[in-house]
UniProtKB/Swiss-Prot annotation:
<comment type="function">
    <text>Catalyzes the attachment of L-aspartate to tRNA(Asp) in a two-step reaction: L-aspartate is first activated by ATP to form Asp-AMP and then transferred to the acceptor end of tRNA(Asp).</text>
</comment>
<dbReference type="InterPro" id="IPR002312">
    <property type="entry name" value="Asp/Asn-tRNA-synth_IIb"/>
</dbReference>
<feature type="binding site">
    <location>
        <position position="220"/>
    </location>
    <ligand>
        <name>L-aspartate</name>
    </ligand>
</feature>
<keyword id="KW-0963">Cytoplasm</keyword>
<feature type="region of interest" description="Aspartate">
    <location>
        <begin position="198"/>
        <end position="201"/>
    </location>
</feature>
<dbReference type="InterPro" id="IPR006195">
    <property type="entry name" value="aa-tRNA-synth_II"/>
</dbReference>
<dbReference type="InterPro" id="IPR004365">
    <property type="entry name" value="NA-bd_OB_tRNA"/>
</dbReference>
<dbReference type="InterPro" id="IPR004115">
    <property type="entry name" value="GAD-like_sf"/>
</dbReference>
<keyword id="KW-0648">Protein biosynthesis</keyword>
<dbReference type="InterPro" id="IPR047089">
    <property type="entry name" value="Asp-tRNA-ligase_1_N"/>
</dbReference>
<dbReference type="GO" id="GO:0003676">
    <property type="term" value="F:nucleic acid binding"/>
</dbReference>
<dbReference type="InterPro" id="IPR047090">
    <property type="entry name" value="AspRS_core"/>
</dbReference>
<dbReference type="GO" id="GO:0005737">
    <property type="term" value="C:cytoplasm"/>
</dbReference>
<dbReference type="GO" id="GO:0004815">
    <property type="term" value="F:aspartate-tRNA ligase activity"/>
</dbReference>
<dbReference type="InterPro" id="IPR012340">
    <property type="entry name" value="NA-bd_OB-fold"/>
</dbReference>
<dbReference type="GO" id="GO:0005524">
    <property type="term" value="F:ATP binding"/>
</dbReference>
<comment type="similarity">
    <text>Belongs to the class-II aminoacyl-tRNA synthetase family. Type 1 subfamily.</text>
</comment>
Length: 590
């Protein structure tokens, strides 16, 4: 029989009508005289009622046999419910069943299909098709759909063209590790799955498309965490002839539409701007969470005046003040903060409590003679806790930035109802990599440097590594609640400048042509000024849904070992397949 509507949509408008619904048994209760079945589908739950004494024999038997997760087709009359349930949309009605057909039976599930059930992550992933039946997960997945629909509506209306770019690409350096795909036809050669469509979308600009977008899968072989997956989805944009502010304005309008369509929230435009240096110096992060204060203070000048070797020998001394919370932090809890600071590169964590007009505990004996100066500089009041890091500027910012987030959560300083958007602008072009022992591009090698700092790229033989620190980029990141939501930049459209950039990154001209020759050649054929941005769709939906792990908004994600417990991917393949690809495994038995 044809379904009348989704079970979760049957409301008072159907009163006294005979309807048909189909779905899964969420709960079955036999209360002696009556059998109640909660029937669930993607839209919600409706209550089915069967009176064994008055119902047809086959209806009573089907209701008696039904168990959790059986799939049923139910036909019946919609009647007013005696005891209403205001918590659900269908709570004012119930269906008196006149026909029940069991479409499919079910074994006992490995976990209850309901929200807030405690299950191991890998068990949820192994039975993901069951996990997705839970109302919360269905809500997350439908929210993802609503988000992509809103994005497409805006971009289509703004003149963007949706273009698919290839998944089988050339492997290029600079960035995370590639996922490699061996070629059977071209023995010993490999494709790389795209970390982003960066170069392809730039080539679409010189092709004359003017405005491109794509909601696209990307792949990065990197260590996983809550907001990362080996395969992820980004909203990829590129435009010709637009400046930095125009691209930001367009992105703001896109986000504002999504927020209104998906969350019913009106966001204020334009979003605030913060330059990179201020983000690092005051928040200790290039993706600052601006929902709360707890800013970093530079005490270097004052700290050098005290008789404390650790302060005197450090490049900088910075601090955060936890207002009115000194009595909430025991020595043990401060030790935990110290360990976190060390994990972020600091040698240690100095601290004092300000109690009854004087410093106590920690390094208080070294600051006693300068109490008034520190009190005035930090605007201290009674029961404040001060945490210091004395180290290099980068380490002090990083360590205190991490502590800031931890303390913000501990002290309830964060308003989790807020959506605080922010642009971080004026980025450095390069950042030092301890692992590579060289400067690397902070975003990617195709970012346009500012005119004022391009001279520091000069490859005339006099450039020093330290000059690269002075180069600034036309780059911009969009941040939401302490997460990088996306990043973009204006791009280089001059071959000479692009070759200078690659040279600064250590590429010899021959290597540059080997890796990026197709782009360099394209730059000889009238390449327009262009720029763009990519938004992380998974991360955006995660934040809209109020989750802290993108697995909650992806239908079939991987675990933290980049594995799929359901399909057992990745897996060993047959020797014959490897032979066809001319691949021989090293240390196969280890």
């Amino acid at each position: 029989m044809k379904r009348t509507n989704y079970a979760g949509n049957i409301t008072e408008e159907y009163l006294n009508q005979t309807i048909t619904v189909k779905g899964w048994v969420a709960k079955r209760r036999n209360l002696g005289g009556l059998i109640f079945i909660d029937l669930r589908d993607r839209e919600g739950i409706v209550q089915i009622v069967v009176n064994p004494e008055t119902a047809a024999t086959e209806v009573a038997e089907a209701a008696d046999k039904a168990r959790n997760e059986f799939v049923l087709e139910v036909t019946g009359k919609v009647v007013e419910r005696a005891s209403k349930n205001d918590k659900i949309k269908t709570g004012g009605i119930e269906i008196e069943a006149t026909a029940i057909e069991i479409l499919s039976t079910s074994k006992t599930t490995p976990f209850e299909i309901k929200d807030d059930v405690e299950v191991l992550d890998d068990t949820r992933l192994k039975y993901r098709y069951l996990d997705l039946r839970r109302p919360e997960m269905l809500k997350n997945i439908t929210m993802r759909h609503a988000t992509t629909r809103s994005i497409r509506e805006y971009l289509d209306g703004a003149g963007f063209i949706d273009v698919e770019t290839p998944f089988l690409n050339k492997s290029t350096p600079e960035g995370a590790r590639d996922y490699l795909v061996p070629s059977r036809v071209n023995k010993g050669e490999f494709y790389a799955l795209p970390q982003s469509p960066q170069l392809m979308k730039q080539l679409l600009m010189t092709a004359g498309l003017d405005r491109y977008y794509q909601i696209v899968k990307c792949f990065r072989d990197e260590d996983l965490r809550g907001d990362r997956q080996p395969e992820f989805t980004q909203v990829d944009l590129e435009t010709s002839f637009l400046g930095e502010e125009e691209i930001q304005e367009l992105t703001e309008e896109l986000i504002a539409k999504v927020m209104k369509d998906v969350k019913g929230i009106d966001v204020t435009l334009p979003f605030p701007r913060m330059n990179y240096d201020d983000a690092m110096n005051f928040y200790g992060s290039d993706k600052p969470d601006t929902r709360f204060e707890l800013l970093l203070t530079d005490l270097s000048a004052l700290a050098k005046t005290v008789d404390f070797k650790v302060f005197q020998e450090a490049e900088v001394v910075k601090a955060i003040v936890v207002k009115g919370a000194a009595d909430k932090y025991s020595r043990k809890s401060i030790d935990k903060l110290t360990e976190q600071a060390k994990q972020n590169g600091a040698k240690g964590l100095a601290w004092v409590k300000f109690e009854k007009g004087e410093f106590a505990g920690g390094v208080s004996k070294f600051l006693a003679e300068s109490t008034d100066s520190f009190v005035n500089e930090l605007k201290l009041t009674d029961n404040d806790l001060v945490l210091f890091v004395a180290d290099s500027l980068d380490v002090a910012n990083s360590a205190l930035g991490a502590l800031r987030l931890t303390i913000g959560k501990q002290q309830g300083l964060i308003d989790f109802r807020k959506f605080n958007f922010l642009w971080v602008i004026d980025w450095p072009m390069f950042e030092w990599s301890d692992e590579e022992e060289r400067y690397m591009s902070a975003h990617h090698p195709f970012t346009l440097p500012t005119k004022e700092t391009q001279a520091f790229l000069s490859a005339d033989g006099h450039r020093k590594d330290s000059d690269l620190k002075k180069v600034r980029a036309h780059a911009y990141d969009i941040v939401l609640n302490g997460y990088e939501l996306g990043g973009g930049s204006l791009r280089i459209n001059s071959r000479d400048l692009q070759e200078e950039m690659l040279s600064a990154l250590g590429f010899k001209l021959e290597d540059a042509n080997e890796q990026f020759g197709f782009l360099l050649e394209a730059l000889d054929y009238g390449f327009p000024p262009h720029g763009g941005l990519a938004l992380g769709l998974d991360r955006f939906v995660m934040l809209l849904a109020g989750k802290d792990n993108i697995r909650e908004v992806i239908a079939f994600p991987k675990n933290n070992k980049a594995s799929d417990p359901m399909t057992q991917a990745p897996s060993i393949v047959a020797d014959k397949q490897l032979e066809e690809l001319s691949i021989k495994l090293a240390n196969k038995d280890q």
